[in-house]
Amino acid sequence: MILGIDEAGRGCLAGSLFVAGVACNDQTALELLKMGLKDSKKLSLKKRFFLEDKIKTHGKVKFFVVKKSANEIDNLGLGACLKLAIQEILENNRSLANEIKIDGNTAFGLNKRYPNIQTIIKGDETIAQIAMASVLAKAFKDREMLELHALFKEYGWDKNCGYGTKQHIEAITKLGATPFHRHSFTLKNCILNPKLLEVEQRLI
């Protein structure tokens, strides 16, 4: 059985970071692939929520989602929050899988304690369990930002999901940051260095 891990909200200026872990066998993963499972960034919002429901209600799928708030990211740092979230998933699910696959190029040093960890760049495009984790994390992030958009409509969170789009940056410059913005280096840097917008927009 494979445990796949992925995140959503890493490059955002607002809202939480969500890290998800999904464990299932290859046969179950194939069932989800036949339903249209792929990297969450290539799915519509409606399709992500549809697959989220299928993953969460499937009897042979085990999942775990960890949320790290904007406040935690400001206080601890993004890297520390990612490591803590992945560690929490591993501590709760390591007995479920003999293989652990994380999207990206770093295991944040956790491979010393969990030697069966494998990091895979663009793993959400090649490993079904990582794609499933990607869908869950992104669906949780989508839902959070839609709820926050109802409170702060000027920032366009229903469209940009907290990323640093032109509209979002302009709203921050004009209205200031909300309690749900990350008041750390990322936020300040994006306002002072507009060139970073291109990088942030690619992450949407």
UniProtKB/Swiss-Prot annotation:
A divalent metal cation binds at D6, E7, D103. It catalyses: Endonucleolytic cleavage to 5'-phosphomonoester. It is found in: Cytoplasm. GO terms for cellular component: cytoplasm; ribonuclease H2 complex. One of its GO terms (biological process) is DNA replication, removal of RNA primer. It comes from the Bacteria. Its main location: cytoplasm. Belongs to the RNase HII family. This is Ribonuclease HII. It comes from Helicobacter pylori (strain P12). The gene is rnhB.
